């Protein structure tokens, strides 16, 4: 459950380390984002010589949340940290590698590129 001012880890090799959610996209009064939702983020920490720099604003898709994802069979998949993958304006990932597991729900949300790059799909 991600809202404005939430801090997230970055799960790709774009050069960003942590980002802050500045807007949840998809509706004028939408408050929360979950796994598979697109948010607007600001880069708060970045490595030198990365593809992005501190202060830049990007779209991102949420790939892991502490709140978790409820499955149809009643199981709940939750993670230790909130994480996102940075996207360009065409909603394609900026990085070429994905770190850590992602959930199968991303497959339904047209993020097959992220699912195929991820080392593990839960």
UniProtKB/Swiss-Prot annotation:
Part of the 50S ribosomal subunit. Forms a cluster with proteins L3 and L19. In the 70S ribosome, L14 and L19 interact and together make contacts with the 16S rRNA in bridges B5 and B8. PANTHER family: 50S/60S RIBOSOMAL PROTEIN L14/L23, LARGE RIBOSOMAL SUBUNIT PROTEIN UL14M. GO terms for biological process: translation. NCBIfam families: rplN_bact (TIGR01067). GO terms for cellular component: cytosolic large ribosomal subunit. InterPro entries: Ribosomal_uL14, Ribosomal_uL14_bac-type, Ribosomal_uL14_CS, Ribosomal_uL14_sf. Signal peptide: none annotated. It holds the Pfam family Ribosomal_L14. HAMAP family: Ribosomal_uL14. Keywords: Ribonucleoprotein, Ribosomal protein, RNA-binding, rRNA-binding. It comes from the Bacteria. Belongs to the universal ribosomal protein uL14 family. One of its GO terms (molecular function) is large ribosomal subunit rRNA binding. The keyword Ribosomal protein applies. This is Large ribosomal subunit protein uL14. It comes from Tolumonas auensis (strain DSM 9187 / NBRC 110442 / TA 4). Binds to 23S rRNA. Forms part of two intersubunit bridges in the 70S ribosome.
């Amino acid at each position: 459950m991600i809202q404005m001012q939430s801090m997230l880890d970055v799960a790709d090799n774009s050069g960003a380390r942590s980002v802050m959610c500045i807007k949840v996209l998809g509706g004028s009064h939408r408050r929360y984002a979950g796994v598979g939702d697109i948010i607007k983020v600001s880069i708060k920490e970045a490595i030198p010589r990365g593809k992005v720099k501190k202060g830049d604003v990007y779209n991102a898709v949420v790939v892991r949340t502490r709140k978790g994802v409820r499955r149809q069979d009643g199981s709940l998949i939750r993670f230790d940290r909130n994480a996102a993958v940075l996207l360009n304006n065409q909603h394609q990932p900026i990085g070429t590698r994905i770190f850590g597991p992602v959930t199968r729900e991303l497959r339904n949300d047209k993020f097959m590129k992220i699912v195929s790059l991820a080392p593990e799909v839960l």
